[in-house]
A protein has these predicted regions:
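Nucleotide/phosphate-binding sheet-loop regions of phosphoryl- and nucleotidyl-transfer enzymes
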Residues: 1-389, 422-425, 432-437, 443, ...
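Conserved structured catalytic cores and adjacent interaction surfaces
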Residues: 394, 398-493
Length: 494
């Protein structure tokens, strides 16, 4: 037996970040703490390095080991890959040693094909859910593995919504989603020149390769340069059995922090969407509800979640940023990591952890990054001016501070205008990881959709850039570079 490249969650622990990546090590640690984690395995960072050494292929030895671990997963879950009785569906997610929000790619619902969708539709008596999973999988796989842009699929969804006279994805029925899945496959064939893969093993290897490949994508390289992350580290891949937040109204998904990442105040801070999958919250596609509302909707899962938060914060002795899913009222933990926070919050959290007896004063001092102290001197609005002014719109204060600049609508324009010495505010429907360089060039960021845990919010807080998200009163006209708000029109350069 050669080198070991694959580890079950039960075989790892939180100290193995270099080998299992941050997400893999924390999934293993949560498993060891007895928390409800959907089981799976992690392919190590060494397999990523090997992939690049072998000329960007996964060698037969590593492929065989991965399939051996799929068999172990089948035994644990009692489900089988590509089976028509009880199919195993998995998520494939990246996990580098250092947290890189939005940089690396995720694929959910892997293992589906037309036959399997029919089976799970009948078995669950929930065809809407089955086809929703499939269309999401085709969309993610096409985007992440085959690099067919998201926008083609978004356009098809928007067309379908317009045809049905609805505004939200959730309002589309089973037949609409089935039709979308077929349109997506046709789009895939038109762009790639081959049929969408039906074989789960082929899908799995394609997805794993895509994660390894994304370690080298332009976004990831920009983020690494800014945050001093060595290229040689590589990324791990987590393959995990799916927990479904999109099976109906007794399901949902959310992202939460054990303390407020903007102020540092103690208490659950986060967001939740019913009948949704994880990507929906983070991608900021629908604007979610506050975590406190979860208590009314899912009292059992909420109670369990509060317990889990307490266990994790005491265990890691730091504020945690967690992703979770509720499937038919039952809680599943998908991720935990030390949460990104503003400099103000970092100061308050460090002091509070000392008061709560979790950290010594020496440890608390080391928790503050000296480079962040300057953001405590962030521009703030003049208190008198604020009282005198009439606000034209309201959104969520996702990242603190005050900013003023000229309006731009794309990341490219933000960079170009900054290069000319202009100060700009980037206005977007929602930001995506591709916008990171434009976000860096901006004084502030304003988005129409998305919440406090959306991509824009998390990245802006990390950069110390002022950000207002989810300002839904804005009517956007991206094509003509203008938007209206409070009865006025605003154009590029205003």
């Amino acid at each position: 037996m050669g080198k070991k490249y694959v580890y079950l969650f039960t075989e790892g622990n939180g100290t193995m970040r270099e080998l299992l990546g941050g997400k893999g090590a924390n999934l293993a640690e949560m498993t060891n703490l007895g928390l409800p984690v959907p089981q799976g395995f992690t392919i190590s960072t060494e397999a990523c390095t090997q992939y690049y050494e072998d000329g960007k292929v996964i060698n037969p030895e590593i492929q065989a080991e991965i399939m051996e671990y799929i068999a172990k997963m089948e035994n644990i879950t009692g489900k089988k890959f590509g089976d028509l009785e009880n199919p195993l569906l998995v998520s494939v997610r990246s996990g580098a040693r250092a947290s890189m929000p939005g940089m690396m790619d995720t694929i959910l619902n892997l293992g589906l094909n037309e036959q399997v969708v029919d089976v799970i539709a009948k078995k669950s008596n929930n065809p809407r859910w089955a086809w929703d999973c499939y269309r999401r999988f085709i969309q993610m796989y096409s985007d992440v593995v085959m690099e067919v842009g998201k926008k083609y699929f978004e356009e098809l969804i928007d067309k379908m919504k317009a045809a049905k006279g609805v505004t939200l994805d959730v309002e589309l029925g089973a037949d609409d989603l089935k039709e979308l899945a077929h349109q997506f496959k046709a789009e895939y064939k038109a762009k790639i020149g081959a049929d969408f893969p039906d074989d789960p093993k082929e899908q799995l290897m394609g997805a794993i390769k895509a994660v390894f490949r994304s370690w080298d994508n332009p976004r990831a390289n920009v983020y690494r340069r800014d945050n001093d992350i060595p290229y040689s580290w590589g990324t791990a891949v987590n393959v995990q059995s799916m927990a479904f937040g999109n099976m109906g109204d007794d399901c949902g998904t959310g992202v939460a922090f054990t303390r407020d990442p903007a102020t540092g105040n103690k208490g659950l801070f986060g967001e939740f969407l019913t009948n949704a999958q994880g990507e929906d919250v983070v991608a900021g596609v629908r604007t979610p509800m506050h975590i406190s509302e979860m208590e009314q909707k899912f009292p059992e899962a909420y109670k369990k979640f509060v317990e889990v938060c307490d266990i994790l914060e005491k265990h890691y002795r730091d504020m945690q940023d967690m992703e979770f899913t509720v499937e038919h009222g039952k809680l599943f933990m998908l991720q935990t990591r030390n949460g990104k926070r503003t400099a103000q919050a970092a100061l308050k959290i460090a002091c509070d952890l000392v008061d709560e007896g979790m950290r010594t004063e020496q440890e608390a001092v080391l928790m503050i990054d000296p480079r962040n102290l300057d953001t405590l001197l962030h521009p703030q609005f003049d208190a008198k001016a604020i009282k005198a002014a009439t606000p034209i719109g309201k959104g969520l204060g996702a990242s603190p501070g005050a900013a003023c600049g000229k309006i731009v609508f794309t990341a490219e324009d933000a960079e170009a205008w900054k290069a000319r010495g202009e100060k700009v505010i980037l206005v977007r429907l929602e930001t995506s990881p591709e916008d990171i360089t434009g976000m860096k060039a901006s004084q502030g960021i304003l988005t129409v959709r998305g919440g406090m845990t959306s991509h824009a919010a998390v990245v802006a807080r990390g950069m110390g850039t002022c950000c207002v998200s989810g300002c839904s009163a804005i009517t956007m006209d991206e094509a003509n570079k203008k938007f209206s708000l409070g009865g006025k029109e605003f154009h590029e350069g205003d």
